[in-house]
Amino acid sequence: MVSTSSFQTTKSEEIFAAAQKLMPGGVSSPVRAFKSVGGQPIVFDRVKGAYIWDVDGNQYIDYVGTWGPAICGHAHPDVIAALHEALEKGTSFGAPSVQENILAEMVIEAVPSIEMVRFVNSGTEACMSVLRLMRAFTGREKIIKFEGCYHGHADMFLVKAGSGVATLGLPDSPGVPKATTSFTLTAPYNDLEAVKALFAENPDDIAGVILEPVVGNSGFVLPDAGFLEGLRELTKEYGALLMFDEVMTGFRLAYGGAQEKFGVTPDLTTLGKVIGGGLPVGAYGGRQDIMEMVAPSGPMYQAGTLSGNPLAMTAGIKTLELLQKPGTYDYLNDITQKLADGLLKLAQDAGHAVCGGHIGAMFGLFLTAGPVHNYEDAKKSDLVKFGRFHRAMLERGVYLAPSQFEAGFTSLAHTQADIDRTLAMAKEVFSHL
C-alpha cells in the first residue's frame, strides 16, 4: 500500500497535463477531474479485486468501484473467463443473441417491477428512453424529479441535478432550452407535501415521478419512513407512473434492488452499472402493458446500434450468477456497516461534525452534523475539509469518490482486513484534519 512518505504521482501529472490538451478538462466525465477536492487527478493503470493501481505504481483500496458496477470486485476471474470465450465469437452482432434472452430472464426474475425489459447502452440512455415511454403511455408531458437526484445528462433531467452537476456547483447547464425544462417539476427529496402540492396544481398533466429510491448522486441519502410508499399512493391516485432509477441501487442493496429492500414496487425501473459487469450497459423495464408500447411492439421509438451487445450481456450474466450465491448480501451488508459505522465513530471521536450511514453495499459520510434528508442539507457539508480528507486518505492508499456528493461502494472482494486498514488510516487522518 501507499505510505505518505513515498506517495508521488509524477506520471499521473504528466499524463493529465497531456490529456488537458486533448479532451475538455482532460477527462471523459467531469467528476474525474478532482475539481471539488483539489489536487491532480490520479491516472489509473490496472485493477484487481478490491484494489486499484495508478501509473506511478501506487496501490489503493478502492471504494469507487468504477462508480458502482464492480460489486464482485474488479476483474473477477469468472467474468474475465466468460468474456474471453465470448470475444472469440465476436464483439458485436447488431442482431438478436441468446445472451440477451438469458440476461433479460435473470433481470425479470430478480426485479419485482419488471415484466419486460429493453437493453440500452448507459443509464442516461435508459432514463431518456423511459421518460419518453412514460409520456407516451399516459399522454401527459410533465414529470416530477427531486433536487439532487441525477438521472443522466439528458436535457430534461438537468434541473437541480446531482452527481457532476452538484460537484461543480452548477444549477443546470447552458445549452438546455427553457422550453424543455418547463416540463420538469422539482421537489425536495423526502418532502411528500411538496409532491402533493405539485400534483394538486397539475392534476392531469403529470406523466410520472422519477427518483433515486436511495440517493447516491448528492451524497448518500436514505428515504424517510413512508416517503416511497407515499409516492406510490400519490401516483396511483393521480393516474401517473412511478419510476425508480436503480442504475446505482439495482442489485447493490439487494438482489432485487431498492424496491425489494423497501417493499415498494414502481411501474418502471431503470438499471445499469452492475448488470453490465463493468461494461457499458443500461436497461429499462416494467409492467408489460407499458413496455409493449416500445417499438417494434408499439409506437414509441427507441433503438441502439450496440444495445444488447454480447460482451456486456455476457459480463452481466456472470455477475448476476455470482451475486446469487448464498450469503452474498449478508456479507456485503456486514462489511459496509462496519466501514460506515467505523468512519462515523472515528470522525465524531476526533471532534468533527459528521453524519452518514449505509444500506446494502452502499455508504456515505457527510462532513456536517446533519441530519441529511435532501440536497439542501447535503450542501451544508464542509467541502474544503472534505477535500483535505480525500487527499489525506488517497496518500494513505484509500481511494474514495473525489466528491462529497457521491456515494461510496463496497464489493465482495473487500476483506475484513481491507476495512480494518481503511479505518486505521481514517483514524490517523481525522486526528489531524
UniProtKB/Swiss-Prot annotation:
CDD domains: OAT_like. It catalyses: (S)-4-amino-5-oxopentanoate = 5-aminolevulinate. Its EC number is 5.4.3.8. It is found in: Cytoplasm. The keyword Cytoplasm applies. Its cofactor is pyridoxal 5'-phosphate. PROSITE patterns: AA_TRANSFER_CLASS_3. GO terms for molecular function: glutamate-1-semialdehyde 2,1-aminomutase activity; pyridoxal phosphate binding; transaminase activity. The keyword Isomerase applies. It is an enzyme of class 5 (isomerase). The modification N6-(pyridoxal phosphate)lysine is found at K273. Keywords: Chlorophyll biosynthesis, Cytoplasm, Isomerase, Porphyrin biosynthesis, Pyridoxal phosphate. It comes from the Bacteria. Pathway: Porphyrin-containing compound metabolism; protoporphyrin-IX biosynthesis; 5-aminolevulinate from L-glutamyl-tRNA(Glu): step 2/2; Porphyrin-containing compound metabolism; chlorophyll biosynthesis. Pfam families: Aminotran_3. GO terms for biological process: chlorophyll biosynthetic process; protoporphyrinogen IX biosynthetic process. One of its GO terms (cellular component) is cytoplasm. NCBIfam families: hemL, PRK00062.1. HAMAP family: HemL_aminotrans_3. Homodimer. Belongs to the class-III pyridoxal-phosphate-dependent aminotransferase family. HemL subfamily. This is Glutamate-1-semialdehyde 2,1-aminomutase. It comes from Rippkaea orientalis (strain PCC 8801 / RF-1) (Cyanothece sp. (strain PCC 8801)). The gene is hemL.
